[in-house]
Amino acid sequence: MHNPQHYMTGFGNEFATEAVAGSLPVGQNSPQRVAHGLYAEQLSGTAFTAPRGENRRSWLYRIRPAAVHGRFSLIEQSRLHNDFGGGPVPPDQMRWSPLPLPATPTDFVDGLYTMAGNGSPEAMTGVAVHLYAANASMHGRFFYNADGELLLVPQLGRLRVCTELGVLELEPQQIGVIPRGVRFRVELLDSAARGYVCENFGGLLRLPDLGPIGANGLANPRDFETPRAAFEQRDGAFELVAKFQGHLWRADIDHSPLDVVAWHGNYAPYRYDLRRFNTIGSISFDHPDPSIFTVLTSPSDTHGTANMDFAIFPPRWLVAQHTFRPPWFHRNVASEFMGLVHGVYDAKAEGFAPGGASLHNCMSGHGPDAATFDKASQADLTRPDVIAETMAFMFETRAVLRPTQQALSAAHRQADYQQCWSGLRAAFQHPPAKNTTSVLR
């Protein structure tokens, strides 16, 4: 699966790659005649005038420009959209079992299923959270998203994502990011695939600042991989599908748009193996805030507050003394959508299965279930807790995640989720009255 020669390493680097020698111009971007009869095309991911450290763009040298295709027409469908509803959002904690695998041939695009979201692509803020379940590769069709960049989190099955700028191979416990506007095709390397997608309408994903952690730790830049140039030259009757302003559109295209022979720049797909995350934790007491598990962050216009954080809860050792070691009970001004790629999440002993999901919106109380609380409260703290064979994650957003109607009414929603806390009984033992200073009456 890991083929280093197909990838270039580093996060946000200025890359240059060509599949045919001599295709990249030297010393300029747009020569009068590009080598080999190619076309020069710039793909901009930020404003031209964005600060240099945040500016993202790539120059593509391709067989045909991206403008060559037929007229778009609307695709009537109801599973993938930005309709997060104008009605009341229930403050309930919510949990879903895994999205069922399809019974009929379904590719990646047709298998996308919108769960929740906030903001909008036209405002360039917020996110949408989707699931996907597929059992077929994309044949004769290509997809791009004009609304946001896509963070793919496979849970079941390997994917081969063929993009304009090269090929990403993904397996569970890896993630892939497809920039806004990049065209791609998803091929299944196994009989079925399922996973999660965060569609980021806001600021481009980046590595979080490390502060006092120092120069190293969490997700290290060298572990991110960007594909080398790869192209195909195919003519035929194909379909180009676009997500634009919350709707799917289709156009006829008489060639494969994956025809970029060479490119240079810093706006490109990339992948990261979550097993390489350098986990930080307490070696004295207490459980630190979960921000220490942040892999990538999308900034907002409020300093210190993210549009979206992507955090993981990977294998780790818990050694804190005099401490309740699992994640504590919590009410959060942010909203948390969680998924499980592999194993068991250490705050939920039962009910949260790989492929499942939970949503704890702003100020909705959540935390370990009764079984986990009882076990951790009696644990022998002279021994470390080795949390192994797990990979949970969270999309955390500053704005409330509004669940879609299909998510609220889904057959795989767990109607009894709140019961996981029903066993948490009052154990308070009232001290003598002389030790009580104030009691509400």
Swiss-Prot record:
The record places the active site at 287 (proton acceptor)
A biological process (GO) annotation for this entry?
Answer: L-phenylalanine catabolic process
For this UniProt record, the keywords arranged alphabetically read as follows: Dioxygenase, Iron, Metal-binding, Oxidoreductase, Phenylalanine catabolism, Tyrosine catabolism
Which co-factor is required? Answer: Fe cation
Q: Which GO terms describe its cellular component?
A: cytoplasm
Q: Write down the Pfam families for this protein, in alphabetical order.
A: HgmA_C, HgmA_N
MF terms (GO), sorted A to Z: homogentisate 1,2-dioxygenase activity; iron ion binding
Q: According to the UniProt record, what class of enzyme is this?
A: oxidoreductase
CDD domains attached to this UniProt entry: cupin_HGO_N
The pathway entry for this protein reads as: Amino-acid degradation; L-phenylalanine degradation; acetoacetate and fumarate from L-phenylalanine: step 4/6
Disulfide bridge partners, by residue number: none
Function per UniProt: Involved in the catabolism of homogentisate (2,5-dihydroxyphenylacetate or 2,5-OH-PhAc), a central intermediate in the degradation of phenylalanine and tyrosine. Catalyzes the oxidative ring cleavage of the aromatic ring of homogentisate to yield maleylacetoacetate.
| Protein known as | Homogentisate 1,2-dioxygenase
Gene name for this UniProt entry: hmgA
